[in-house]
């Protein structure tokens, strides 16, 4: 304010947290009891009292608050899915509204009872909800046993759980497994899992998923002071029905793709023919009197696995022998060991994580003797064509150089020789706050 009058301004980078698509004004409000009285499904708005003053009521379904606006230098952000009402206008009040979307009549909910019915309620997970959590995993359209508390919590000492559950009209419709790193102020979905995308009920809609993802981001930011949310998506081959609503939500939240690992999966319904070299190896394995069987000989296989991973990839198993035995005892129908034996000795093995849609080889290893007999080739074909022929996919795992985004071309060449083709495991970064 100076002798020339007053000036207020707003810049998209520093003051308005979205690209402004529409601006409108409210004026001549004398005698008007209220304006607004609705919520938007997708549109965000910033409201400013350009002249005069008024009260802004905001209701997010859990908290109702009233803010008095009386300055052109201060605005209030109205997030999507928040109910708003403008009232108690002073004489001569002028209101400016900046919106993130063009006008869309279908984006409005103008009946408060309907609004309450459409709300998604967020509840933080606690151990008392473990039974309900696990029951939802079983019926979710994209659930796997890795989301069960018996799997997620086996290393609870290493991860601070901050998982969330979402309800609509009292019914559980979504869950987000998540862990909190206080030092880095980062939430990860989930720090102890290969993937950790949102679990959805069959009835959950795309709009529901948008609301859940936005609510989760706001909760992580407000409750923990989190600055980042690392989100590891669940590959589509694990979905019992299409479940990529979260990918659209990530796009809307301007999430950044920061990691992509390439796995190789065999389609058991539509086999791509094996390459000639793999066919020769499989033929050789069939002449070597190998026996393929499910086994409980974890203590015999684990030293072989550790030796192979160290010598060929300079790495170690993610699980210790005690951890994998504990998990296999908790999930005997899902975590299985298959071996190839020659003269009674284990010469190759595969630890399989079995889900409804996928048999995933969590670990593969072959001894020097097994290599001579092409035992691992024979074991993979046994899994894909016999043991798991009724599964849509056999996932042979990723082929990345440890700790990098670089492809191990030799390893993926071997897997593709069986007719396996690429499935990606993606990681996104969502900026919070």
What are these regions (language model features)?
Residues 180-197:
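Conserved acyl-donor/pantetheine-binding loop and adjacent beta-alpha core of acyl/acetyltransferases
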Residues 193-240:
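A gly/proline- and charged-residue-enriched helix-loop-helix capping module
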Residues 78, 250, 415:
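Conserved active-site tyrosine of GNAT-family acetyltransferases
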Residues 91-93, 159-161, 223-226, 335, ...:
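Short, high-confidence coil segments that cap the C-terminus of an alpha-helix
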Residues 77, 194-206, 364-373, 400-402:
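A short, internal acetyl-CoA/4′-phosphopantetheine-binding micro-motif in the GNAT/acyltransferase core
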Residues 167, 176-178, 212-215, 334-433:
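Aromatic (often tryptophan-rich) hydrophobic motifs at membrane interfaces
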Residues 1-76, 91-94, 98-119:
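Non-catalytic, conserved peripheral segments adjacent to functional cores
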Residues 122-185, 233-370:
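A conserved beta-strand-loop-helix scaffold within acyl/acetyltransferase catalytic domains
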